[in-house]
């Protein structure tokens, strides 16, 4: 027995040491700045005064349970294993168009989808960047939530100087540490949801550049050389005219949550309206379907163009992201003239086929009151009313796979 006990004790000791080393490494990594910082001081005081902050966390305007089925992740994996597995990643690199962002005529109002929920926008002579992810993963761990092949088209070095950087919320597929750090020398002003500025300030952004909005608040970029003001400071400001039209950035509600650690909803999430005298655009941010779309459409619409959360839906979290058919209804609620699907095309966060959102939204958009625009990543979408044709590019990826299958026969 003694002979057996010695190896057993050695194994137990080694196992304990390994567990201790792993725990120590995890605790050390937990101090990495990638996780951001919680709101403190004046920022926290403003958060606690928000009508949307209740019992220590931000709340949605209507009841929004996080999970909507009792099925566990393990059960879901087992069901997928037994049945037909979804093709959550494309079998080939996605077709893209790398537009030279520095060479674009700034007088042209346009939007360029950068994949998932990232957008480069030119509006009223200003350059706006929304939820950029210039990284090959969207998580605190490099092997989790990897980008699709072919979609790592741009880096921060490819961008011109940015007048306004907008971050809708602090999830890793919308706010990336590496990207934020790389963009810092290029960004003049930041507009984000209440509390998110704590992360950005911890990552080296000057506090005076950061403007945080509660739902319904407005940030105004004026047409003078005194660049901007928030709706929280309505005093008149004057300066020399820049020749650019005024731009309003309006924070709108959504049905979602936030958090970069296990403690959720300590910062706000938002959609946004971009409004100039000649254009109205809407970005939903992450959201489930709800009455807020009709309210936004009535108050701020009609919209020349909208992009809506159309992917990463799942029966387990039915209120966190929209089904394609719900997004179609939201586009009509908003009184949109054109609609582009978002939250798709770069990451796998749910377990549907990677191209299913495009197929379903195309079918559901037949006969609707808006035009469905489905550009490739990197292709400019012009907002001046010109005719533009957008082909179902995702079908070319499927055809490549089918052709490869036929070659093997």
Residue map of PLM features:
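Metallo-beta-lactamase
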Residues: 2-145, 152-155, 193-283, 304-310, 360-378, 384, ...
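Acidic/histidine-rich helix-loop elements
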Residues: 134-151, 257-263, 314-320
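Catalytic core of the metallo-beta-lactamase
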Residues: 118-122, 243-302, 318, 322-326
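Active-site metal-binding motif and surrounding structural segment of the metallo-beta-lactamase
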Residues: 50, 143-194, 211, 301-307
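Metal-dependent catalytic neighborhoods of phosphoester/phosphodiester hydrolases
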Residues: 176-185, 349-359, 385
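Divalent metal-coordination and catalytic microenvironments
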Residues: 121, 131, 169, 176, ...
């Amino acid at each position: 027995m003694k002979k057996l006990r010695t190896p057993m004790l050695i194994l137990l000791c080694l196992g304990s040491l390994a567990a201790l080393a792993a725990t120590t490494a995890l605790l050390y990594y937990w101090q990495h700045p990638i996780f951001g910082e919680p709101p403190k001081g004046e920022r926290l005081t403003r958060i606690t005064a928000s009508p949307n902050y209740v019992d220590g966390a931000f709340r949605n305007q209507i009841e929004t349970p996080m999970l909507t089925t009792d099925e566990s992740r393990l059960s879901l994996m087992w069901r997928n294993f037994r049945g037909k597995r979804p093709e959550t990643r494309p079998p080939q690199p996605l077709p893209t168009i790398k537009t030279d962002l520095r060479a674009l005529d700034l007088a042209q109002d346009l939007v360029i989808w950068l994949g998932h929920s990232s957008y480069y926008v030119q509006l009223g002579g200003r350059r706006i960047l929304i939820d950029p992810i210039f990284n090959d993963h969207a998580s605190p761990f490099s092997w989790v939530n990897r980008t699709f092949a072919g979609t790592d088209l741009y880096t921060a070095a490819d961008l011109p100087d940015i007048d306004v950087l907008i971050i809708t919320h602090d999830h890793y597929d919308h706010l990336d540490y590496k990207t934020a750090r790389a963009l810092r020398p290029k960004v003049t002003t930041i507009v984000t949801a209440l509390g998110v500025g704590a992360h950005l300030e911890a990552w080296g952004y000057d506090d005076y550049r950061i403007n945080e909005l509660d739902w319904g608040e407005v940030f105004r970029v004026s047409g003078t050389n005194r660049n901007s003001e928030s709706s929280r400071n309505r005093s008149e400001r004057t300066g020399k005219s820049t020749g650019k039209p005024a731009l309003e950035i309006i924070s709108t509600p959504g049905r979602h949550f936030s958090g970069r650690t296990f403690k959720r909803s300590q910062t706000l999430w938002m959609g946004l309206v971009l409004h100039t005298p000649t254009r109205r655009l809407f970005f939903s941010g992450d959201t489930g379907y709800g009455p807020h779309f009709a309210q936004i459409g009535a108050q701020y619409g009609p919209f020349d163009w909208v992009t809506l959360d159309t992917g990463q839906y799942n029966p387990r979290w039915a209120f966190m992201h929209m089904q394609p058919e719900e997004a179609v209804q939201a586009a009509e609620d908003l009184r949109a003239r054109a609609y582009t699907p978002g939250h798709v095309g770069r990451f796998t966060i749910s377990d549907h086929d990677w191209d299913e959102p495009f197929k379903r939204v195309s079918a559901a958009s037949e006969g609707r009151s808006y035009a469905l625009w489905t550009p490739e990543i990197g292709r400019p979408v012009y907002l001046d009313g010109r005719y533009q044709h957008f082909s179902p590019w995702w079908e070319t990826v499927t055809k490549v796979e089918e052709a490869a299958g036929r070659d093997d026969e």
